[in-house]
Amino acid sequence: MRKAGSRARAEAEGPHRAMEGGEVTGDRLKADTPDVSFEELLRLQGQGRPKAHKQLVAGNSTRTRSPQQPVCVADKHRPLEMSAKVRVPFLRQVVPISKKVARDPRFDDLSGDYNPEVFDKTYQFLNDIRAKEKQLVKKQLKRHRSGEERDKLQQLLQRMEQQEMAQQERKQQQELRLALKQERRAQAQQGHRPYFLKKSEQRQLALAEKFKELRRSKKLESFLSRKRRRNAGKDRRHLPLSKE
């Protein structure tokens, strides 16, 4: 009687124990096997067939598995991903940045070679503008008889005259070089060997042309007097100091 009572008690408690086990994994079993009833799963567990139960759960889970996401192709321009646990090396490879170089069009090869003759012809209008500015400065200089403003105008007029004289000297040198080039070309056409003047000889010819121009403009005496005073001042620097 005791054995029959214990067996009946076990059969009665069997479903209850299965239900207790189902409280732990019931939600998961329902999610994995939506097509199988919960009572069928408990019956399989109670009959001691865990293998069939696992196969049933595994088969339903494979059917309900969501499709995989498409694999994205990595972009070669993406930022470099590194682990934060990796120690940064002492010498790192830094991406070099191109240095900005200042470009002056006056000295750039893309602007072409400097030709004084072409430059003077292209910017011939600047001489007229300088002449008008010089006349304007002279008029303003007549209005200011004294004071700081007159000194500034006097210095400006002197600088403009010096620039004009320097431009005339450059023009004379260009004309002299052009004449020498034409003379050498004529000698080559006649069958003679062309003679190239030295720089010292070119300076002497330029000085002779300058003296001729000063004589024509009646400024030779003033030029020679200034040159004498300049040379005298240079000689005084080299003289020994007088002892008193």
From Swiss-Prot:
A motif (Nuclear localization signal) lies at residues 226-229. Residues 141-190 form a coiled coil. Its main location: nucleus. The keyword RNA-binding does not apply. Disulfide bonds: none annotated. GO terms for biological process: ribosomal small subunit biogenesis; rRNA processing. Belongs to the RRP36 family. The modification Phosphoserine is found at S61, S66. It is found in: Nucleus, Nucleolus. The keyword Coiled coil applies. The lineage of its organism: Eukaryota, Metazoa, Chordata, Craniata, Vertebrata. Pfam families: RRP36. This is Ribosomal RNA processing protein 36 homolog. Residues 1-74, 219-244 are annotated as: Disordered. Involved in the early processing steps of the pre-rRNA in the maturation pathway leading to the 18S rRNA. It comes from Mus musculus (Mouse). Residues 8-33 have a biased composition (Basic and acidic residues). Keywords: Coiled coil, Nucleus, Phosphoprotein, Ribosome biogenesis, rRNA processing. One of its GO terms (cellular component) is nucleolus. Residues 225-244 have a biased composition (Basic residues).
